[in-house]
Amino acid sequence: ISVCDLPADRGQCTAYIPQWFFNKTTEDCEKFVYGGCQGNANRFETKDDCIANCGCNLPSKVGPCRVSARMWFHNPETEKCEVFIYGGCHGNANRFATETECQEVCDRYQKPGFCYQPSETGPCKGSFPRYYYDYEDGECKEFIYGGCEGNANNFETKESCENAC
């Protein structure tokens, strides 16, 4: 049984600790009060942690309403954040207002943040072959680095790029 299938469990103690759990019925992350001991693993400190663990692999869900809002969801098949049209009600936890928000939540356990930066030559005039991770294509590609500044998406070998991203 998956952590995400477990019910909210306050535990036996009487502390008042606001936490989040994934509600299998609503397919969303909801607040509950944890007592401080026992309970189960369907308990997260933040809503984003809950979504990252339980929501990002859900299919997009339009819902029955007809607002037609442009939203983003994490597509578990392509492992990318993609646009979908949300009806405005009864969706699920895999729904984000922006692509950046989707990436920050759903990719947090997959790739470091610098893997989403573009290649950056920098202001210097050198000509050093380097590799960067191209998030759109999901692969490491060669680019020319000028020798200074730039960003962290910059690797001397394709292998080191692939290991990092």
UniProtKB/Swiss-Prot annotation:
Chain positions carrying an annotated carbohydrate: 23
Cystine pairs annotated here are 4-54, 13-37, 29-50, 56-106, 65-89, 81-102, 115-165, 124-148, 140-161
Q: Which InterPro entries match?
A: Kunitz_BPTI, Kunitz_BPTI_sf, Prtase_inh_Kunz-CS, TFPI-like, TFPI/VKTCI-like
The UniProt entry, under Pfam families, shows:
Kunitz_BPTI (PF00014)
What Gene Ontology terms describe where this protein resides (cellular component)? Answer: extracellular space
Tissue expression remark: Expressed in the tentacle crown. Not detected in annelid body.
Query: In this protein, which residues make up the domain named BPTI/Kunitz inhibitor?
Result: 4-54, 56-106, 115-165
Record's keyword terms, sorted: Disulfide bond, Glycoprotein, Metalloenzyme inhibitor, Metalloprotease inhibitor, Protease inhibitor, Repeat, Serine protease inhibitor
Q: Does Repeat show up as a keyword for this record? A: yes
Q: How is it modified after translation?
A: Contains 9 disulfide bonds.
Say which domain of life the source belongs to. Eukaryota
Which CDD domains does this UniProt record tie to the protein? Kunitz_SmCI_1-like, Kunitz_SmCI_2-like, Kunitz_SmCI_3-like
Region (Inserts into the active site groove of a carboxypeptidase and inhibits activity by emulating a C-terminal substrate) location: 1-2
Which GO terms fall under molecular function for this chain's record? peptidase inhibitor activity; serine-type endopeptidase inhibitor activity
The transmembrane segments are: none
- What function does this protein fulfil? Potent inhibitor of pancreatic carboxypeptidase A with a Ki of 27 nM, and of the serine proteases trypsin, chymotrypsin and pancreatic elastase, with Ki values of 6.9 nM, 1.83 nM and 4 nM, respectively. Also inhibits carboxypeptidase A4 CPA4 and CPA1. Does not inhibit cysteine and aspartic proteases.
Q: What is this protein called?
A: Carboxypeptidase inhibitor SmCI
Q: Which organism is it from?
A: Sabellastarte magnifica (Feather duster)
